[in-house]
Amino acid sequence: METLASLYNEHLSTLQQRTRDVLERHQLDALLIHSGELQRIFLDDRDYPFKVNAQFKAWVPVTQVPNCWLWVDGVNTPKLWFYSPVDYWHCVEPLPDSFWTKAIDIQPLVNANDIAQLLPVQRERVAYIGYAQQRAQALGFSAENINPKPVLDYLHFYRSYKTDYELACMREAQKTAVAGHNAAHEAFLSGMSEFDINLAYLMATGQRDTDVPYDNIVALNEHSAVLHYTTLQHQPPAEIRSFLIDAGAEYNGYAADLTRTYVAGSKNTADSKNDFAALIKDLNNEQLGLIKTLKCGVNYTEYNVQMHQRIAKLLRTHNLVTGISEEAMVEQGITCPFLPHGLGHPLGLQVHDTAGFMQDDKGAHLSAPSKYPYLRCTRILQPRMVLTIEPGLYFIESLLAPWRSGEFSQHFNWDLIETLKPYGGIRIEDNIVIHENRVENMTRDLKLA
């Protein structure tokens, strides 16, 4: 098995080749990639938690240090100015010494403002990549060379194709996230509150709330019907019926994004609890069934439609919708209030990774179908793409309400829906890798139930 260092060197060669290509295409000499800067809270003397520029951490696994700069030209050894001030107020990161550092020319940057004197004088044909545009202007970058769209389009498009190093990092992120999910499940079974379940997850993964790749969704009962629920109640509800957790982790800047849904057990199990448990089981089977059909050369949008067909089957099988064919359910949009979000999204340096709608390296955009406006990917599946597959089935009153008085109202089993609404909803999410002749399910490979 190749070491992470050798995988990183191959990864760096790939990035260098992409850089040569994009520089030649746009008649540039180099890219100056900024890790970012701390952002001061308005009328305060504190800063918001630092979030690194994704294009920066694509090159080096430095995710917690602002004011770093990377100069790349595709030919010479990438040069990293690493921010290392003399500071007794804050902890200062030492100059890195790790598996990747021999491949990078690392220089200390003691004062953030010194970068102006350290950069090459001639930078008229250099593009700045980062979010501190005022800083770039102060360094003399012209407006057209600050985050030029054609350059970003190119870089974003090829980020969809993960190197072996990136895949190795993402598998490690999966391991951390799975450990957290198992700990959270145990906390749920012991009757803990949402707040305490989240703490159990963070403890098991060794993360703080500011470290996770996205805000953890830890939802009990009807809170599971709020797609991005992040409130975290401090007290458990009087009756715990269900639990949805959507939480991830990072490794060297690469994300995992996993979701599971569970039903609470009890000696006197209500019929509604049995119904909800059966829905979880069957949605899990449909999710796995869809994953088995994934293959190269097919647009992700097609699988989104197929998932709605599978949702229609569940609605009919569980008598949630009756007296209408599965085909008509999909055609008339009856599945949409039950599954209002898309099948999934690209995953990588960002949770909702770039280029989900991009059809080529020049930025051609293909929007989501009007019927499924929240789908986050319209790409044709190709080897080395990493995506989430996360179908759901929810009982959301604001989405169901228009159907109560609509022409198809008689087909909805409103009594059964009312009994299931207190459980909120279901989402099951795995992270998969597209290979030439197979699909790798990184999540199930780690036995996350």
From Swiss-Prot:
Function comment: Splits dipeptides with a prolyl residue in the C-terminal position.
Binding-site residues for Mn(2+) 2, renumbered to this chain: 246, 257, 429
Name of this chain's protein: Xaa-Pro dipeptidase
EC number: 3.4.13.9
InterPro entries xrefs: Creatin/AminoP/Spt16_N (IPR029149), Creatinase/aminopeptidase-like (IPR036005), PepQ_N (IPR048819), Pept_M24 (IPR000994), Peptidase_M24B_aminopep-P_CS (IPR001131), X-Pro_dipept-like (IPR052433), X_Pro_dipept (IPR022846)
Cofactor note: Binds 2 manganese ions per subunit.
Catalytic activity: Xaa-L-Pro dipeptide + H2O = an L-alpha-amino acid + L-proline
GO biological process: proteolysis
Names of required cofactors: Mn(2+)
Domain of life of the source: Bacteria
Keyword field: Dipeptidase, Hydrolase, Manganese, Metal-binding, Metalloprotease, Protease
Binding site for Mn(2+) 1: 257, 345, 390, 429
Keyword ATP-binding appears in the UniProt entry: no
GO molecular function: aminopeptidase activity; metal ion binding; metalloexopeptidase activity; phosphoric triester hydrolase activity; proline dipeptidase activity
Family, similarity comment: Belongs to the peptidase M24B family. Bacterial-type prolidase subfamily.
Species of provenance: Yersinia enterocolitica serotype O:8 / biotype 1B (strain NCTC 13174 / 8081)
